[in-house]
């Protein structure tokens, strides 16, 4: 059976994965490749860069996310390709990716949210951040199971044109976050979301930034022209798997990391300083 790269790489049973966000509509960047609806693409505006005042209770968020997840997939019970056992497991998620939309560090109870997911029986909690709030990461009282930082530019000029930050000094904040990664005990990942016409050049500079962060893994991945991203770059402008693999090989040469896995269907390559990835579900 086909499954997400998180299962192939890290042992996560991805039919039991819940994706969610505590910061709907709030982000400090407006990335060209983002599939979400942004104020720009909707032609309306709202304040989306400031931390959410107050914020919902973490337990309420977790319980609401589980209920929404169950409602979303319950109809698969009528699909002859889905077994009763598989559906029953899927209705009981045990992995969460806090990454669906928005910037999670704008939710000021992020540590409590991690703890709440774990207290509700979740085995693994992934967080994906754009790195523009190093202070929030520095103050995390509870670490996730794995921390991702999206680094989608090799230099400040490319960052400005590709990630389109909406706060002052964003590039410097991302650089500060890279320096912070070495202080985390959990596995860390640098994610490069790539589009040939935008941000696939200057691999040497990508390599220098990776060396500063010394992450456990690097994930070069092709951006997808889906959702609202279709308004910003076309399907035929997406990176091919061959281009992503070539990028990964060059990055491996420059960093000393090794390509330890890949998944064609997800258009992604996994590099690491380890010989093999850590199985987070074993």
What are these regions (language model features)?
Residues 1, 12, 16-19, 225-229, ...:
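Accessory C-terminal segments flanking Radical SAM cores
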Residues 1-24, 38-61, 65-85, 89-90:
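N-terminal [4Fe-4S]-dependent radical SAM core
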Residues 15, 91-93, 263-267:
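Short Gly/Ser/Thr- and Asp/Glu-enriched loop/turn motifs at secondary-structure junctions
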Residues 20, 27, 31-34:
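Short cysteine clusters
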Residues 32, 37-46, 224-229:
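Surface-exposed beta-strand-to-loop junctions
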Residues 78-235, 239-242:
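Conserved AdoMet/S-adenosylmethionine-binding subsite of the radical SAM
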Residues 211, 242-282:
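C-terminal accessory regions of radical SAM enzymes
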């Amino acid at each position: 059976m086909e499954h997400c790269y998180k299962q192939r790489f890290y042992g996560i049973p991805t039919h039991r994965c819940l994706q969610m966000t505590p910061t709907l509509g709030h982000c400090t960047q407006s990335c060209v490749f983002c599939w979400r609806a942004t104020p720009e693409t909707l032609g309306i505006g709202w304040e989306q860069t400031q931390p959410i005042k107050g914020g919902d209770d973490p337990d309420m968020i977790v319980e609401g996310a589980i209920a929404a997840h169950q409602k979303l997939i319950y109809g698969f019970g009528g699909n002859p390709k889905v077994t009763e056992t598989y559906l029953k497991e899927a209705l009981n998620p045990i992995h969460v990716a806090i990454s669906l939309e928005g910037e999670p560090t704008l939710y000021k109870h992020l540590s409590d949210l991690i703890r709440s997911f774990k207290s509700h029986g979740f085995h693994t909690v992934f967080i994906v951040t754009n790195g523009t709030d190093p202070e929030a990461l520095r103050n995390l009282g509870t670490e996730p199971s794995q921390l991702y930082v999206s680094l989608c530019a090799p230099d400040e000029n490319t960052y400005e044109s590709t990630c389109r930050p909406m706060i002052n000094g964003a590039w410097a904040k991302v650089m500060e976050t890279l320096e912070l990664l070495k202080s985390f005990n959990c596995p860390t990942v640098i994610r490069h979301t790539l589009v040939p016409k935008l941000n696939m050049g200057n691999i040497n500079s990508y390599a220098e930034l990776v060396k500063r962060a010394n992450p456990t893994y690097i994930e070069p991945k092709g951006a997808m022209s889906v959702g609202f991203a279709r308004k910003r770059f076309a399907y035929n402008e997406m990176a091919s798997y061959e281009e992503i693999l070539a990028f990964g090989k060059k990055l491996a040469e420059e960093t000393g990391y090794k390509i330890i896995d890949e998944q064609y269907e997800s258009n992604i390559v996994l590099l690491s300083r380890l010989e093999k990835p850590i199985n987070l579900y074993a």
